[in-house]
Amino acid sequence: MLNNSIRVRATASVANVSCGFDCIGYAIAKPGDIVTIEKQDQPGIEISMSGIKYESIPVDPENNTAGKAILSLLDTVESKQGFKVHIEKGIPPGSGIGSSSASAAAAVVGVNELLNKPLENSELLVHGMAGEAVASGGFHADN
């Protein structure tokens, strides 16, 4: 049976731990973002949002961390599949606990699953980093 939708939760994280700045990190059980992804017949990414302080986050896929991460993944696997993406922000934007990276991570995991896992989990990081570049201006994985 083929799945047409998936719901993925990504937790907050801390990457700047004492003298282990960007080297030592950990995940936090709460809060977290919930990303619901549904296949759609037409190509493209359609993003909607709800939750904590989401109003300032762009829904244009090129300017949204989850959207950009999905576009990066789709480009790599050469897929024209379209998706509706709903991001429920549980991690406050700008809080320093991985708000942007959580949305991107959940998005690439979910899309990869809906595409029947064309990529290994280890190959997903680079696509999350493409999303993070939208928020931070840099291609890095610090959360």
What are these regions (language model features)?
Residues M1-S95, E113, K117:
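ATP-binding N-lobe of GHMP and related small-molecule kinases
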Residues K80-N143:
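Gly/Ser-rich oxyanion-binding loop with an adjacent helix/lid
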